[in-house]
Amino acid sequence: MNDESSLSGAATLPRDNLLMRVWGVVATILSVLYTAICLIPAWTSARLGKGHWVTPVTRIWTWLIFRTCGIKDEIEGLEHLKGLDSFILVANHKSLVDILAVFRLMPGEVRFVAKREIMKVPVFGYTMANCGNIVIDRQSGGRAIRHALAAQREGYNICFFAEGHRFNDDLIHEFNDGAAWLAIATKQPCVPLAISGTGALMPRGSKFVRPGQRIRLSLGAPILTAGMRGGDRVELTQRLETAVRVMYRSTP
């Protein structure tokens, strides 16, 4: 009996793995197709100066991708956003899917702080830069503040991936102080955001998604920046990093 069970398990496991791999390849191809199709109205919105039109497009885009990939998603801590007119999300960064998860699960309109290198991507880079996102480089301090204030006036909330880039592990790495600096300069509250599960779905360097994963966004209590000065950005960064670490560790 034990031998038969072992043989049965050995025969089933490779087949299950094969089905998951096929699902992953098909889901990746379809996700690329969805992206190409949805990029057309998004790019058109950017050309027309109608950045707000991008939000419903991204809702449809991310819904299609998440359903195709069999992703189970949830968000907790929305009560922390009550009473906030605008804010800066400060999050960890594990995967390209982080952006999709924020677009899909966060209420309101969210835009991102992106490095100038994104502009080199045809069509996508132009769309990102002209739909309310903040494109920065090392010399863009004053311009970043102006763009953040403009985004605030347009009703956008800004998301900042404070680790600087993606890491292919299950750790929270040291936060850069750029988000804290921008929040203090614009006097906007910071909301810590822990993103869990996206690294398993599509790790850095992976060409195909791993379907059937669970993604969770956890929002922490906002940290008000009114009255803070530039010298407070180190302490603010540490508080944000600690909050994200605690929420990330508590995520099953």
Residue ranges and their predicted role:
Residues 75, 89, 112, 217-219:
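Generic preference for hydrophobic
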Residues 13-74, 126-130:
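A transmembrane-helix-recognition feature enriched in membrane-embedded lipid enzymes
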Residues 85-91, 110, 156-162:
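Generic beta-sheet signal
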Residues 92, 129-131, 208-211:
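Short, hinge-like loop/turn segments at secondary-structure boundaries
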